[in-house]
Amino acid sequence: MSLLCLTGETFSCNPLLPYGSPNSMLKTLTEYLFSLPQYILPQHLLSAAMHRLARCENRLWKNAFINTITRIYGVDLSEAKEPNPEAYASFNAFFTRALKPEARPQSTDPDALLCPADGAISQIGDIAAGSLFQAKGKYFNATELLGGNTELAKPFENGKFATIYLSPRDYHRLHMPISGTLREMVHVPGQLFSVNAATANTVPNLFARNERVAAIFDTEAGPMALVLVGAIFVASIETVWHGEVTPPTVAQVKTWAYSGDAPSLAKGEEMGRFNMGSTIIVLFGENAVDWDAALQAGDRVMLGQKLGRLAKNMTFSS
């Protein structure tokens, strides 16, 4: 069975495949029913409204919002520097809360690549001729992910990638997997689909069609890209060197180049944050790093744990 979206895209969901169990067919159909309405929702308008609501400092509103999210998602405030939910000035202050230093110990392996965030691995693996695996036979392109810049994407053509999804319960600050010096930042306009498993399974080119901010660093492993992907209700994306990058959204790709006084960030240092949750994609070049072979899609990961190591016979192109 094919589904024709209002955008003109056709999706093959085949819920009646003879080899599928009733449960898997129902799951597939449910995922499409969740995803399709998002094509007609005013995604940016809803996200702008959330931007305002999340910063509202009315005590009754923000306390009710914080307590509801804490209860529904099981947020562990004992890890936070400020464990009292009512002490936060706004919902956004709660959502981007700092953790106690001991809450996320870093791997002590000097060659370790640290996990940049709390979350779940959506996918992890190799980039094949510039193509990254999304889910269920769907792929997206590194060049499109980085705003259509072929030169920017070239070093990652046959490299490694890891896609990590942050849920509403997670810590929403993002940290450096390895020390690096910022070379370029790119803000790519786009849509704002949800980025959970249902949309990853059903929306083509999801991560390369949503609004995103990509930061390119020079590291001892060669070029590294950290791509912060927006989603519906992700009210803003910010970095420590620029502040809030979005909103406002932009009509065209916008690029910042850094040279002489470029920011340098240490391994484990905060580099940015999501004001509401979404996804971070980490890219490295060919023969630069090796992921931990035990990690796979669906695994829960924590900030500071080892995602992989510098490759033993490291070679890379800049």
Predicted ranges, named:
Residues L3, F11-S318:
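Contiguous, well-folded functional domains in the mature portion of proteins
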